[in-house]
Amino acid sequence: MVKDKAPDLSKHTPMMRQYLALKANHPNTLLFYRMGDFYELFHEDAEKAARLLDITLTTRGQSAGVPIKMCGIPFHSLEPYLARLVKLGESAVICEQIGDPATSKGPVERAVARIVTPGTLTDAALIDDKQDLWLLAVTTHRNTAGIARLNLASGEFILIEVPTEQIPATLERIRPAEILYPESWTPNFGVDVARTRQPDWYFEFDSARRLLCDQFEVASLAGFGAEGLKPAIAAAGALLQYAQATQSGKLPHLRGLTVEIEGAYLGLDLATRRNLELTETLRGQPSPTLFSLLDNCVTSMGSRLLRHTLHHPLRARDIPAARHGAVEALLEDYGRLGNEVRKALRGIADIERIAGRVALRNARPRDLASLRESVARLEGLRAPLSDSPAPLIAQLFTELETPYPALELLVRAIAAEPGAQVRDGGVIAPGYDPDLDELRSLNDNCGAFLVDMEARERERSGIASLKVEYNKVHGFYIEVTHANVDKIPDDYRRRQTLKNAERYITPELKAFEDKALSAQERSLAREKLLYEAILDALLPVVPTLQTIARAIAQLDLLAGFAESALKRNWCKPEFAAETQLSITGGRHPVVEGELTNQAETFIANDCLLAENRRLLLITGPNMGGKSTYMRQVALIALLAHIGCYVPADRCVLGPLDRIFTRIGASDDLASGRSTFMVEMTEAAAILHHATNQSLVLMDEIGRGTSTFDGMALAFAILRHLIEKNQSLTLFATHYFELTRLSHEYSELANVHLGAVEHNDRIVFMHAVEEGPANQSYGIQVAALAGIPTAVVRAARKQLREFEQRAAVDPLQPDLFAQGAPEPAEPEPHPVVEQLAAIDPDSLTPREALDALYALKGLLR
């Protein structure tokens, strides 16, 4: 956290001096200052919080001659307000009273108890249980970006280095909750998340490396494979320093770094993730998406792994193939294995996040009770897995071994139904600690003592209505109505006067009060001490709990895949060494799911792409299903690469490195880009980066400009994809002239989506057939959309005129006719090419001089 210069406190009241001293350490963060039963905010913080949280802003008194603006919330309502702030991208500092008001001279001592930021949340009430929460830091060195990300709840700490132009795509894949970056930057991240500037020295490599080595208790980072990753280590150091500051100390559950290799995942750029609607629809809704369809997971850990897996399909096939084998094993004996696993998973709590809170020492009593019940279920979860032939399931069986010492501790120490907070008591189980049991016994005997004393005092005083009672404000007292005050014994001392009664205390009752209240206070203090000792005892078990949590998530994911495959009749995909994407009876998983809900049937289609058939040119009417067909092919490929069965009768896939999509039309007003500019930008990315192992989907290229321009661009892009990229491509178009290219390129095949016209009406068949379409049915689709009949009639008349005129004198030349050859574009001079590749801002003086000599050498 960045600190401001300390303010002049001499003219302020003692309480405001204390507040301002704390606030000076957190100038850019809302500070919640505990005062009795409320958290108060002052001055600018109060104005901001009142606006964001819709609470009353008031002014009370003055300090240093300035009116004190303030607002507040009850202490027991803090969490909902924090949740609202975090959703708005705000951070908060929680300042608690740590001194005793009864013994304090001046303001009660206060200290920062925790700092809540969008990327460092661990409280279950503040975070989505089905989504990982990543804190991310990024910095650059020359043309390389170092990115570090931390999941504080699970302890995952991951590094990656990518070219700087890939920062937006990487952030879109990770979807962090908060991004840290050097304050000297003007970032353009391309994602809308909370951003936190940090001093540039936070990202200094040497200090970052030392900090990381201290955290992991190692001499170097070579053991993690990270020693040479300077930008990533710099980012990781800034990240760790920030996390330690927010958690007020060390993070014992962070035990190492994972280096993510660029290219380990099937490449999905921003446009592809959006167009395939993996976890969010094009309209920003959570369903219907691939995630909402597949999320059969029983545990929140499984749901989070599913979301992560959808955005991280693996390029290598070993892990997906192992998952296919595990799903197959679950399906072969689903009643005994798959179904039993899902039953056993029910009731298992979020062990991953509870373990994180144990490590951070902010686990609540009910967290430990949930952990106890979940660990006790592990043997029942393991039992069905014991004889599975699938290697992955056998591995999970080993990882799910019950940590019995931890379980025994939780059973002995934590009450069956503990209180919500340690401060409320009732957390430690009876019989765990003799001293606590004795203190509780004193406290529990209060009721019997009061009943006995009430009977004795009634007999002694002759007052039948006399009561001996207790409340938290006035303690123990004897209550006598005004009509009977003349009968009270001499040793009664008045404690409080009410409208209809007087309350008294006696020496005997006072002595008991001191003893009872002391026992209660000591009992709560003892429980707090014991609870902290239990957290200490559980700390060494945290790595084991993290392993168990990962195994449960993996098993839940696999069981969910098996459930989807069984319910929807999906097949096990096959991986092949040669170039191909062969799908028989493929369906779009999400569209089929929606149609099934409406008791309708999805029309299955085949797709064959191979070495000698690399491009399918798709024609057909609007609404005929071209975009759905293209997306289903991409989704089937992606599902295979995450280890899931696929919606098809059969599927064989060769090697893939990336999936590109150019589908749909939308402008980007925020960046000032028109629909056509967005289309061309996405097409440019494909042409620059697609390889012969990429799957490319391109829909309606060139429609955002004039007919001639659009057709010329579509032709040139199509030719480039065939000749240069040589990708496996699905290319949908309304330019029927492009279909003639099948005579020029043997690897291009024409297919179309069929339709039938009857009495000026159109019926879409949604079936993919070989060969080109013969017309687009645009006017019929316009009629279906509700265009006025008169307009449709006029359009038909105009179309006939165009067709008659074209038969005599074609409106447009044949773009594919062989005309006079165009003059060849001059080849750029080598000096120009090399000069264009130089980034002067990234060169050292020595490197710039070397580059200049190299250019001069080329001129010779």
Swiss-Prot record:
Highest taxon listed in the record's lineage: Bacteria
Entry binding sites for ATP: 620-627
GO cellular component terms listed in the entry, alphabetical order: cytosol
Keyword Cytoplasm: no
Keywords, comma-separated and alphabetical: ATP-binding, DNA damage, DNA repair, DNA-binding, Nucleotide-binding
Any one GO MF annotation of this record: damaged DNA binding
GO process terms (BP): mismatch repair
Family: Belongs to the DNA mismatch repair MutS family.
Purpose of the protein: This protein is involved in the repair of mismatches in DNA. It is possible that it carries out the mismatch recognition step. This protein has a weak ATPase activity.
Record-given protein name: DNA mismatch repair protein MutS
Gene: mutS
